[in-house]
Each structure stands twice: as structure tokens, then as C-alpha cells.
């Protein structure tokens, strides 16, 4: 399965609160993003995610990250969540999410983990933490993976190095602290989002 959004960059808004969520999500969508992840270790995510789905679910793939348990998938499905991102391989989490029709992008680091995730039904993979492995590692791993599986670099990706990950065969990237840090201004989020979009478009020219 090819990645289903127009821009294969996932905005990871870790630590965002319900009061600021809509403004920051609006900023990244205005910049061109169409996939957003709210990690479940963010404050009051149970309020943020439904509000974001209601406001932007028709404009972007709205999802949750750091999903660790099948029962969390159940709760997220009831909220209308469309994307599940995990830091690890939990086959039941993957199967449960696929059963709800969600897109699942689990975190993996080895070929064994990658194929375990694919056997459970994952449609995409995130290599995490990418900065610990480097682009050449991902390039080698990609050589044994199905060609239609979108691989995302997550961890340490910046506008300045995004092209290296794309050149290594990544479809795109998950963007965390270089895009958004808890408490930063909406203007800063918009600025960084625009920088990432520009870097991606230049990388794929």
C-alpha cells in the first residue's frame, strides 16, 4: 500500500494541550501537511483528539501516537481516529487498528520487527529512532522490504537533513521536536511546518 496522503510528512505534536491543539493543527495543515499525530503521552489527549477530528478530519489524516494497548485502539476508533502510530511492534494493536479500517504505522528497527508488523497488517513502517541508525541503514533495510510499503524516518529529522532520508528510500518522515515543542508559539509551528514542506518538495524534485 502506498501512503495515502498527498504529503508524506507526519506532524507529531507531542505534549500539546486541548486549549492549543486546534491552532497548531490548523497551522501545519495551512502549511500543507495532511497527516497529524497526537501522542498519547500528551496532556488530556482524550479531549484533543476528538476536537481535532471534528475540526480537521475532512482535511487531514488525524491520528494518535505512542499507542501501546489494544484497548487504546478501541477508544481511538470511537473518537474517529484514522491513523495509529506506535513506538514498538504489538501485533494485536496492529490487527485491532486494521480491523477498524485505520492506517497503522508501527515503529521498528530490524527486518524481523518490520516483517512481524507487516504480517499483522501494518500498511506503513516507521524506523525509530532513525538518528541512531542513519540513512544508509534504512537504505539497506528497504532492500528487503516490499517495494509498496511506505517507510518513514522518525527521530532526528530536520529540514536540513530531510533530503538524506528521502534519498535513502524513505517515503517521508515523522516530525517531532524540530517541528513542535510543547508550549511553543503557533507562529513557530507555522514557520517550521513551512520549512519542512519546502525541504520535502526540494528533495523530491
UniProtKB/Swiss-Prot annotation:
Family under the similarity heading: Belongs to the KHG/KDPG aldolase family.
The protein depicted here goes by the name 2-dehydro-3-deoxy-6-phosphogalactonate aldolase
- Per the UniProt entry, the Enzyme Commission number(s) are 4.1.2.21
Matching InterPro entries, A to Z?
Aldlse_KDPG_KHG, Aldolase_TIM
Q: Where does 2-dehydro-3-deoxy-6-phospho-D-galactonate bind?
A: 14, 66, 126, 156, 176-177
- Among the record's GO biological process terms, what is one? D-galactonate catabolic process
Annotated site, Plays a major role in determining the stereoselectivity, chain positions:
154
State the protein's purpose: Involved in the degradation of galactose via the DeLey-Doudoroff pathway. Catalyzes the reversible, stereospecific retro-aldol cleavage of 2-keto-3-deoxy-6-phosphogalactonate (KDPGal) to pyruvate and D-glyceraldehyde-3-phosphate. In the synthetic direction, it catalyzes the addition of pyruvate to electrophilic aldehydes with re-facial selectivity. It can use a limited number of aldehyde substrates, including D-glyceraldehyde-3-phosphate (natural substrate), D-glyceraldehyde, glycolaldehyde, 2-pyridinecarboxaldehyde, D-ribose, D-erythrose and D-threose.
**Major enzyme class:** lyase
Q: Which PANTHER family match?
A: 2-DEHYDRO-3-DEOXY-6-PHOSPHOGALACTONATE ALDOLASE-RELATED, 2-KETO-3-DEOXY-6-PHOSPHOGLUCONATE ALDOLASE
Q: Identify the species of origin.
A: Escherichia coli (strain K12)
User: What Pfam families is this protein classified in?
Assistant: Aldolase
**Which Gene3D superfamilies does the entry mention?**
Aldolase class I
Q: Which residues form the active site?
A: 37, 126
Which transformation does this protein catalyse, written as a reaction?
2-dehydro-3-deoxy-6-phospho-D-galactonate = D-glyceraldehyde 3-phosphate + pyruvate
Annotated positions for site Orients the nucleophilic substrate: 14
Q: Give the record's subunit note.
A: Homotrimer.
Entry superkingdom? Bacteria
What GO molecular function annotations does the UniProt record carry, in alphabetical order?
Answer: 2-dehydro-3-deoxy-6-phosphogalactonate aldolase activity
Knockout consequences: Deletion mutant cannot grow on D-galactonate.
On whether Transferase is a keyword of this UniProt record, the answer is: no
Amino acid at each position: 500500500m502506498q501512503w495515502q496522503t498527498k504529503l508524506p510528512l507526519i506532524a507529531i505534536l507531542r505534549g500539546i494541550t486541548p486549549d492549543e491543539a486546534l491552532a497548531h493543527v490548523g497551522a501545519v495543515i495551512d502549511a500543507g501537511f495532511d497527516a497529524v499525530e497526537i501522542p498519547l503521552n500528551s496532556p488530556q489527549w482524550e479531549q484533543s483528539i476528538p476536537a481535532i477530528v471534528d475540526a480537521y478530519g475532512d482535511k487531514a489524516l488525524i491520528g494518535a501516537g505512542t499507542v501501546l494497548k489494544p484497548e487504546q485502539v478501541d477508544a481511538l476508533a470511537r473518537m474517529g481516529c484514522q491513523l495509529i502510530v506506535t513506538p514498538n511492534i504489538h501485533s494485536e494493536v496492529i490487527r485491532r487498528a486494521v480491523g477498524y479500517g485505520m492506517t497503522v504505522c508501527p515503529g521498528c528497527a530490524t527486518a524481523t520487527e518490520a516483517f512481524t508488523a507487516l504480517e499483522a497488517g501494518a500498511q506503513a513502517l516507521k524506523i525509530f529512532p532513525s538518528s541512531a541508525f542513519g540513512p544508509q541503514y534504512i537504505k539497506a533495510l528497504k532492500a528487503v522490504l516490499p517495494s509498496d510499503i511506505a517507510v518513514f524516518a522518525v527521530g532526528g529529522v530536520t529540514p536540513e537533513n530531510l533530503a538524506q532520508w528521502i534519498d535513502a528510500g524513505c517515503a517521508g518522515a515523522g516530525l517531532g521536536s524540530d517541528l513542535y515543542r510543547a508550549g511553543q508559539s503557533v507562529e513557530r509551528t507555522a514557520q517550521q511546518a513551512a520549512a519542512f514542506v519546502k525541504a520535502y518538495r526540494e528533495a523530491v524534485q
